[in-house]
Amino acid sequence: MENAKMNSLIAQYPLVKDLVALKETTWFNPSTTSLAEGLPYVGLTEQDVQDAHARLSRFAPYLAKAFAETAATGGIIESELVAIPAMQKRLEKEYQQPISGQLLLKKDSHLPISGSIKARGGIYEVLAHAEKLALEAGLLTLDDDYSKLLSPEFKQFFSQYSIAVGSTGNLGLSIGIMSARIGFKVTVHMSADARAWKKAKLRSHGVTVVEYEQDYGVAVEEGRKAAQSDPNCFFIDDENSRTLFLGYSVAGQRLKAQFAQQGRIVDADNPLFVYLPCGVGGGPGGVAFGLKLAFGDHVHCFFAEPTHSPCMLLGVHTGLHDQISVQDIGIDNLTAADGLAVGRASCFVGRAMERLLDGFYTLSDQTMYDMLGWLAQEEGIRLEPSALAGMAGPQRVCASVSYQQMHGFSAEQLRNATHLVWATGGGMVPEEEMNQYLAKGR
């Protein structure tokens, strides 16, 4: 972006200067509104989410047999919700900032099949596509036992079709493993920052991996192009997909059930704050949408991004959304948080969700490494760097009097609050790689 344009952008949005300087930045959204007001802008409804629930239930008998690790939950892919009191104390000590309320961790990092939040959206979209093809071919009815999809006849049928996706890693892992298991031919277009072990794991499942020297945006674009030339190839579009988004949104009702099981209350007197790592936006956007439908105006969602890849904060704050990239303002989009290394936000999620998100913040790679080490020491839980992005959120919220006043929170409401950090990945990171991460923390 030329200097004059840049200067005028900074004059209009002074916060951009801090982003350019790679400062850890917090922006509380002044335009946040009620669910009733914000919902029409999403373009999806509670019914759409219920349809996604129903589809995942239909596929549960299939998943329970296709993936032994889901048998115990009857083919439902869901993660644990755990309290992390020792980590809460450690954060308070390190940052000299009390966290009012209780700190919890949602362990999507340990979801079965692919060990990340992408096991929600990625697997869901592959299943939705497989169901559509099988229904159209008359091989399946909605009342069937879907475990019949494991038969050689279905494998043969699906092998005529292929799936393509562009990814920095975890989405590719989810879509690749699921597509290959069903019988699709599958190609994952991987950006330069994708971890070698993720590529190796995909290849071990018979997935074709195409590697690029460039970033996420290029991998997605090339994947899209390659798919266009083949009528039997379905491209899963991480930047725009409503189906992926709905796969993630199912998490809202599931979390509500987990809260009920644990006797946790969310209402006006007991607010819930949720901190979601954000790359292109589909995962956190879908989860936040589901949470809003489940908990209404009593849940407050925040997106967390690396200082080197603040695409969603930049897009929503300036109102330019996908019309601006971090590279346009001189930021390199290079971060250890490979799942969040996205320079240009989704053209769908920011516009759909901007009225329903309470805020956005950035944190440095070093902060992620530090917290990764503390969590391993204090709670014995090991995550990949990007999964720690949410962990910086509770301090930002508890330290901001202006945010608390904006929403009229009393000291008592904050004492009764639940802070939920969404851990997005790391359950499948190889030991030696994890040791390298741990060595980088202070």
Swiss-Prot record:
EC number, as in UniProt: 4.3.1.18
Residue numbers carrying N6-(pyridoxal phosphate)lysine: K118
Pfam families: PALP
CDD domains: D-Ser-dehyd
BP GO terms, sorted: D-serine catabolic process; isoleucine biosynthetic process
InterPro entries attached to this UniProt entry: D_Ser_am_lyase (IPR011780), Ser/Thr_Dehydratase (IPR050147), Ser/Thr_deHydtase_PyrdxlP-BS (IPR000634), TrpB-like_PALP (IPR001926), TrpB-like_PALP_sf (IPR036052)
Keywords noted in UniProt: Lyase, Pyridoxal phosphate
SUPFAM superfamilies xref list: Tryptophan synthase beta subunit-like PLP-dependent enzymes
Cofactor: pyridoxal 5'-phosphate
Catalytic activities: D-serine = pyruvate + NH4(+)
EC category: lyase
GO molecular function: D-serine ammonia-lyase activity; hydro-lyase activity; pyridoxal phosphate binding
Subunit structure: Monomer.
Family: Belongs to the serine/threonine dehydratase family. DsdA subfamily.
Protein name: D-serine dehydratase
Organism: Shigella flexneri
